[in-house]
């Protein structure tokens, strides 16, 4: 009796291995298809991610340029009693570039002064 049980167990094991091998070829093909589709999908997803990354970098650079323009200082201006003219920065608001007393013989350039009333 024990011999028959061992023989039947061996037979079941051989048959399971045999039929398992028959389905393995189909399983391998299905596995290859799944892997190819996953890699194809991953490739497309990676391309979409790269495109999105490039778009984000372009937007970020545009925003940084705008922010740099917004935070940039205005050109400096000359204050009161400071030389002005074509070789110097312009006078600040509220001041005008005028030829004061001594211009020509003492001073080489006009100066930023408050405009005279009158």
Swiss-Prot record:
The propeptide sits at: 17-76
Tissues with expression: Expressed by the venom gland.
Signal peptide start and end residues: 1-16
Keyword entries, A-Z: Disulfide bond, Ion channel impairing toxin, Knottin, Secreted, Signal, Toxin
- Give compartment(s): Secreted
Query: Which superkingdom, per the lineage?
Result: Eukaryota
What molecular function terms (GO) are annotated for this protein? sodium channel inhibitor activity; toxin activity
Q: Name one GO cellular component term.
A: extracellular region
Cited InterPro entries: Toxin_22
Q: Which cysteines are joined by disulfide bonds?
A: 77-92, 84-97, 91-112
Supply the Pfam families for this chain: Toxin_22
Comment field on protein domains? The presence of a 'disulfide through disulfide knot' structurally defines this protein as a knottin.
Which family is annotated? Belongs to the neurotoxin 14 (magi-1) family. 06 (ICK-Trit) subfamily.
Q: What does this protein do?
A: Ion channel inhibitor.
Query: What protein name does the entry list?
Result: U16-barytoxin-Tl1e
Native source organism of the sequence: Trittame loki
